[in-house]
């Protein structure tokens, strides 16, 4: 796996799923391929994106700044500086300085990532802030190691939280989660169906599923009534894809 592929993988792992994630993935691909060279426009676009947390925006801004060539005097962006300030906690800043000194001695991506993983997310963000604000310099490879270590920590905590929700025994949370998943699956089906004639059937199934979820929420149904809803939808989607000559078995 190339370095940039690895960076893209880690960064995208902390972006919530949805159309915006696909858009960010495309921007990252363009930046890494050298196709997007207007850093200012890129940062303005990033700043106005909804849904993303300030820290995720800060990390993306840091990655764009590391990758896109820019004039020496280009202003640093406030939204990135604020996100990478470690919440203004002096402990984070102290640890960030210690980490920075260690990173100065590293020359490889994996070496830097290994060193960084033993620090807290706040210290890692502060260390990125030091580099972003030009208070310290490390090689691009080492900076990418720092980015990936931060993303790994964030993704770990997101995964723990997600696992807690999926394994919860609370029937109301499970019921709502199944309805949300069914609804987003239906939305994805509608987007994939496009405008072909065969698509009418898939659109019909998706639309009925969304109406059903709305009705279930309106009248308040038994928590077990949503069981299998998403799987039924996915079976319909796969049947539709088969007819269209597309074989994709990996949706479940």
From Swiss-Prot:
GO terms for molecular function: RNA binding; structural constituent of virion. Keywords: Host nucleus, Membrane, RNA-binding, Viral matrix protein, Virion. GO terms for biological process: viral budding from plasma membrane. A motif (Nuclear localization signal) lies at residues 101-105. Pfam families: Flu_M1, Flu_M1_C. It is a peripheral membrane protein. This is Matrix protein 1. It comes from Influenza A virus (strain A/Equine/Tennessee/5/1986 H3N8).
